[in-house]
Structure formats: C-alpha cells, structure tokens
Amino acid sequence: MNKFLFFIFVFVGISFAGDDTATKDYDIVWRTINFAIFFGILFYLIKGPIKNAYNARINRISSRLEAIQTKLKESKEKKEASKKNLEDVKQKCVELIETAKKEAIQLDEKIQQSAQIDIAQMQKSFAEQKEFEIRRLKKSVTAEILDELFNEKSVNLSQNELINLVQKKVV
C-alpha cells in the first residue's frame, strides 16, 4: 500500500512538473524528482537487508542477554546450593564436635575405671605380697631362733621359756 501511494505521488509530481507554465530554464525540478525516484528505489532495495541486519543484531543481543540471564540464574542456584551445603557442613561439624566431646568423656571414664581397677589389683597384690613376706620372715626368724637354740647345748631352757623367746622375736 505504501509503495502504491509512493508511486502515485511520484507520478502526480511528474505530471505537475510537466506543466507548461513552469519555466523551462531550470532543471532543478527534474533533478529533485530523479533524486526522489533514486532514493525511493535505493530505499526499496536496501530496506530488506538493513532490516534483516538490524533484526539479526537484535536477536544476537537478546540471545546474549538470555545466555547471561541463564548464567546468572545458574550462579544464583549454585550460590543457594553452596549456602545450603555450608549450613549442612556447619551442622555436621557441630554434631562431630559434640560426638567427639562425648567420646572423650567416655574414654576418660573408661581410662579412670581401668586405672582404678589396676590400682585395686595392685593394692591387692601388694597386700598379698606383704602378707606372704611377713609369713616368710616369721618362718625364717623362727627357724633361725630354733637353730640357735638347738645348736647351743649350753643353754637349757624350758619349753615355756622357748615359747616366750620365740614370741618376743616374732613380734
């Protein structure tokens, strides 16, 4: 429709330009008409490629914008995932610390119980060893005294005196 109107105006302009009342010395009118026709044809021929180039540029810009927005969205999702992961790791760290504290307390109690059992066993062993040594010493002292008495023939003691001597030595 626009082309049709354009050609009508061009032909109307040409028909008025062909009027005999105009001075024929000037060719400015014909040059203007030729320029308008040339410009119209040039516009008609170049309009499509320029429009296509412009649309292609718009499409490239919009595709880049979409790619950037997609990357931005992915970055935000990664950021949120990282935040969530960080919170999970923090929670696990707190749980691990609590578990480590409980294990340390349990290990400490276990070591203390083991040490107390070892101490009790050592005390019992010491008491038994002490008891054994006391009995051994009593026997050796008694044997020594008796050997002295029996080896000395000059000493004549009664049985009661011997028992008293042994008791004094032992105690």
Curated annotation (Swiss-Prot):
MF-aspect GO terms: proton-transporting ATP synthase activity, rotational mechanism
Transmembrane region(s): 3-23
Keyword Ion transport: yes
One Pfam match: ATP-synt_B
Annotated keywords: ATP synthesis, Cell inner membrane, Cell membrane, CF(0), Hydrogen ion transport, Ion transport, Membrane, Transmembrane, Transmembrane helix, Transport
Subcellular location: Cell inner membrane
UniProt superkingdom: Bacteria
One cellular component term from this protein's GO annotations in UniProt: plasma membrane
Main location: membrane
Assembly description: F-type ATPases have 2 components, F(1) - the catalytic core - and F(0) - the membrane proton channel. F(1) has five subunits: alpha(3), beta(3), gamma(1), delta(1), epsilon(1). F(0) has three main subunits: a(1), b(2) and c(10-14). The alpha and beta chains form an alternating ring which encloses part of the gamma chain. F(1) is attached to F(0) by a central stalk formed by the gamma and epsilon chains, while a peripheral stalk is formed by the delta and b chains.
Function: F(1)F(0) ATP synthase produces ATP from ADP in the presence of a proton or sodium gradient. F-type ATPases consist of two structural domains, F(1) containing the extramembraneous catalytic core and F(0) containing the membrane proton channel, linked together by a central stalk and a peripheral stalk. During catalysis, ATP synthesis in the catalytic domain of F(1) is coupled via a rotary mechanism of the central stalk subunits to proton translocation.
Family: Belongs to the ATPase B chain family.
Name of the protein described by the UniProt record: ATP synthase subunit b
Lineage: Bacteria, Pseudomonadati, Campylobacterota, Epsilonproteobacteria, Campylobacterales
